[in-house]
């Protein structure tokens, strides 16, 4: 969601008013230009904050809906790994506000659609960053929630409950449901047998930003877990937003 107008006081949006007050209470941002740049599938919203030639991102994460602390925690982990993730400039955990460094507005998906020939270089950079996360993440992964059997079952259930049942109206009969549950058991068993690493959990083209230095910038990492080593690389190469010929994936 892109907004062209600067954010001002809004009698219908208490969160915007609080964010405005918090940002403008800092001497460096009293007269900053603040514009909403996006929202995501959660309750979080993001705003670009410009002051002179500098640009930052403010994150609004309502504390009753989202865990701002998990973003802060994982961001610090990634910073220690020298991975290109947003740095925390200022934080107000109680209110659910963070001020972050700005990684720009070009995500991998947009670049790949416009310039498919850039795929090789972009994916090589992404895989190098993923290797850093898995290698240096050994120090931090046990501090993350486990991607255990319970969580795997919950996420697999989304396929049937939301896609099959609600979205396309497909109801499984007894035989189909039995086969589906057997498939889930096999997938869960396979995942639990794999070596455990630091898992981003949404490592795909919309969460990777093309940057001039230390490409890619990595965002939307707050749901990181300790889980199977193949999870993130499959998210990247079997991206739900863009598909590649099998020969290219291999």
What are these regions (language model features)?
Residues 2-30:
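Juxta-kinase regulatory segment immediately upstream of eukaryotic protein kinase catalytic domains
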Residues 19, 25, 138-145, 150-151, ...:
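An alpha-helical support segment within catalytic cores of ATP-dependent transferases
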Residues 29-47:
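ATP-binding glycine-rich phosphate-binding loop
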Residues 39, 93-95, 224:
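Short glycine-enriched loops at secondary-structure junctions
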Residues 43-50, 58, 133, 184-231, ...:
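Active-site acidic catalytic loop and adjacent metal/ATP-binding pocket
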Residues 47-149, 153-154, 168, 192-193:
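ATP-binding pocket architecture of kinase catalytic cores
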Residues 149, 153, 205, 225-227, ...:
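Glycan-recognition and catalytic cores of secretory/periplasmic carbohydrate-active enzymes
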Residues 158-167, 230-250:
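Active-site activation/catalytic loop segments of kinase-like enzymes and analogous catalytic loops
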């Amino acid at each position: 969601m892109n907004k062209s107008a600067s954010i001002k006081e809004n009698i219908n949006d208490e969160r915007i008013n609080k964010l405005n007050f918090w940002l403008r209470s800092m001497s460096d941002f009293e007269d900053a230009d603040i514009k909403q740049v996006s929202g995501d599938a959660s309750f979080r919203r993001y705003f670009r904050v410009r002051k002179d030639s500098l640009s930052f991102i403010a994150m609004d994460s309502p504390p009753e809906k989202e865990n701002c602390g998990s973003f802060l925690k994982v961001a610090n982990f990634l910073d220690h790994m020298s991975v290109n993730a947003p740095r925390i400039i200022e934080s107000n955990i109680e209110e659910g506000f963070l001020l972050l460094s700005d990684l720009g507005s070009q995500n991998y998906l947009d670049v790949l659609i416009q310039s498919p020939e850039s795929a090789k270089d972009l994916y090589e950079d992404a895989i190098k960053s993923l290797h850093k996360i898995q290698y240096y993440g050994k120090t931090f992964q046990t501090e993350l929630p486990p991607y255990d059997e319970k969580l795997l079952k919950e996420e697999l259930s989304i396929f049937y409950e939301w896609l099959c049942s609600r979205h396309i109206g497909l109801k499984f009969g007894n035989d189909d449901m039995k086969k589906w549950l057997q498939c889930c058991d096999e997938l869960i068993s396979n995942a639990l047998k794999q070596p455990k690493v630091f898992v981003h959990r949404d490592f795909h083209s919309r969460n990777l930003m093309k940057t001039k230095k230390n490409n890619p910038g990595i965002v939307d990492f707050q749901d990181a877990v300790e889980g199977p080593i193949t999870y993130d690389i499959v998210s990247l190469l079997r991206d739900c937003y863009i598909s590649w010929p099998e020969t290219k994936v291999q």
